[in-house]
Curated annotation (Swiss-Prot):
DNA-binding positions: 31-50
One term of GO molecular function: sequence-specific DNA binding
Pfam families with a match to the protein in the record: AsnC_trans_reg, HTH_24
Domain spans labelled HTH asnC-type: 12-73
Protein's recorded name: Uncharacterized HTH-type transcriptional regulator YwrC
InterPro entries reported in the protein's UniProt record: ArsR-like_HTH (IPR011991), AsnC-type_HTH_dom (IPR000485), Dimeric_a/b-barrel (IPR011008), Tscrpt_reg_AsnC-like (IPR019888), Tscrpt_reg_AsnC/Lrp_C (IPR019887), WH-like_DNA-bd_sf (IPR036388), WH_DNA-bd_sf (IPR036390)
Keyword Signal: no
UniProt KW Transcription keyword: yes
């Protein structure tokens, strides 16, 4: 009989929550400045952040890039219906596509929900006709083009 060891859920205290809230808004803040805001030393803040990283609470630090500022003007949400036996295969291929920014398996008849960004309509059409439609198991594709973004948040906010 084998037992898998599971790490128990990490209990966050108020200081951890403060650190996460500040990092969510100001990911480039120094340990020293963060320590001043939460009344801890630089070393104590660094130790807590390392613990949060090791526990998987913090998955990564990243820069949020404005696509329009670098010439990417088409943002599209896709619902892709896939035959159940091909779902994993299609998902693995789509997650490798540079234009795909997020990909989720949703409830419903083998639905993949996906977001993609493209420089123009022609690039999106090429993605559809040459990359998505030919995938084995794809039954149907429904897409909606983003008109205006009101809110977009990376990660979870406490």
């Amino acid at each position: 009989m084998s037992h898998e060891y599971q790490i128990p859920n990490l209990v966050l205290d108020e200081t951890d929550k403060q650190i996460l809230t500040i990092l969510h808004e100001e990911g480039r803040i120094s340990y020293t400045d963060l320590g001043k805001r939460v009344d801890l030393s630089r070393v104590a803040v660094q130790a807590r952040i390392n613990q949060l990283i090791e526990a998987g609470v913090i998955e990564k630090f990243t820069a949020v890039i404005n696509p329009a500022k670098i010439g990417i003007h088409v943002s599209v949400f896709f619902n892709v219906e896939v035959e159940p036996q091909f779902l994993e295969e299609v998902a693995l291929k789509l997650e490798e596509e540079p234009a795909v920014t997020s990909l989720y398996h949703m409830t419903g008849p083998s639905k993949l929900h996906m977001h993609g960004i493209f420089t123009n309509d022609q690039e999106m059409e090429e993605f559809l006709t040459k990359r998505l439609y030919p995938l084995r198991g794809v039954v149907s594709v429904d897409c909606q083009m983003l008109i205006k973004r009101y809110k977009s948040r990376m990660g979870m906010k406490l």
